[in-house]
Amino acid sequence: MMPLPMNEFLQQSMQAGGFDLDFEVVEWGAMLLGYRSAPDAPASKGVDALNISLSYTDPSSMFRYWHSTSYSPTNQNWGHWSTPHLDDLLQQAQETFDPGERDKILAQAHALVVDEAPWVWIVHDLNPRAMSPHVKGFHPAQSWSQDFTSITME
């Protein structure tokens, strides 16, 4: 991903909608500290939002991002966003062991998150990469997890 052009595009797009964005550029570790802190904690630097790269490994991960018991600093609901109906759906999904039924519940939860939009999704990473022609054996994964064991240099 290319953070600077992505953020510049975001800033221009939001400005067209009447939002004035300023960025507080910080070192990655400082951003993670802010993300793992409460929104009003000093580590969050008084910002209203975080632009952080997160990956979804499973639809059930919605619980840690949006359930009201998942507020930071103990979990990952940094914005402390909540809605009782979503809490109910996510709790049902946690307690349902039939995969088909759980999928139906998570689909409802997903639809609610899409409609309510607690986050703005910035990018769908299609793995842009640049490398030397001397690198051989590299096959980009369609995820954040990359296997480097097959790479050689010629």
Put a short name on every predicted segment.
Residues 36-45, 64-95, 124-154:
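Short, solvent-exposed loop/beta-turn-alpha elements that line the ligand-binding surface or hinge
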Residues 13-68, 105:
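Periplasmic binding protein-like
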Residues 1, 29-30, 127-129:
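Short, internal active-site loops enriched in acidic
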Residues 42-53, 96-133:
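Bilobed periplasmic-binding protein-like "clamshell/Venus-flytrap" ligand-binding domains
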Residues 1, 50, 81:
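A short glycine-/small-residue-rich loop at the edge of a beta-strand within enzyme catalytic domains
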Residues 1-12, 146:
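Bilobed "Venus flytrap"/periplasmic-binding protein-like clamshell domains
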Residues 5-9, 16, 30, 34, ...:
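Extracytoplasmic/secreted proteins, especially bacterial periplasmic and envelope-associated proteins
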